[in-house]
Amino acid sequence: MVQCLVVDDDPRILNYIASHLQIEHIDAYTQPSGEAALKLLEKQRVDIAVVDIMMDGMDGFQLCNTLKNDYDIPVIMLTARDALSDKERAFISGTDDYVTKPFEVKELIFRIRAVLRRYNINSNSEMTIGNLTLNQSYLELQVSNKTMTLPNKEFQLLFMLAARPKQIFTREQIIEKIWGYDYEGDERTVDVHIKRLRQRLKKLNATLTIETVRGQGYKVENHV
């Protein structure tokens, strides 16, 4: 089941969203502040976050930036602030979508599901290809009785490739999906992560391999 973090200092909004998420079979974890949300994430993994902007202490912009950079969690901003400058700041902070109050809760749920699809997150956060099972909730790879936990970026990269076998992804596409469009580091970081993933897959004796397509990028092949 999808785990959704909802952060807002208005308890009525928290209860309203949570009740509708539960109807849609989405687990809701509600928190009244950015600080409380980060405390929760020390012990609870979530798949997506819905975040208000105007909160005491850590505001939504700061929280969004932390969720994206430290946890790589998709974020939807939900706020009464509808100025273009606020939207610009939100997207610079890393938000994946922006919804203004008052809002239709069904539209919010549509947007949650759309963002989850972009991140290849499904209801059980698990995918099997060949002899390899990827568990997104625990960032784990499993082949037979062997299990390996990966760093977040490595796992998300492999999950993205494995979700579309044989599809070629360029470095630019990978960076935008995994690190974000505003990433300013060396694009060769993709090559480093691919090299590590290949070593891990070989160690597990996985039937899955990551192939280099010269001049284009990378793709996954399953050898069964």
Curated annotation (Swiss-Prot):
Residues that bear 4-aspartylphosphate: 52
Molecular function terms from GO: phosphorelay response regulator activity; transcription cis-regulatory region binding
Listed SMART domains: REC (SM00448), Trans_reg_C (SM00862)
A GO CC term attached to the entry: cytosol
Key word Transcription present: yes
Gene Ontology terms describing biological process: regulation of DNA-templated transcription
DNA-binding region: 124-222
Protein role: Member of the two-component regulatory system HssS/HssR involved in intracellular heme homeostasis and tempering of staphylococcal virulence. Phosphorylated HssR binds to a direct repeat sequence within hrtAB promoter and activates the expression of hrtAB, an efflux pump, in response to extracellular heme, hemin, hemoglobin or blood.
Protein name in the entry: Heme response regulator HssR
Protein source organism: Staphylococcus aureus (strain Newman)
Organismal lineage: Bacteria, Bacillati, Bacillota, Bacilli, Bacillales
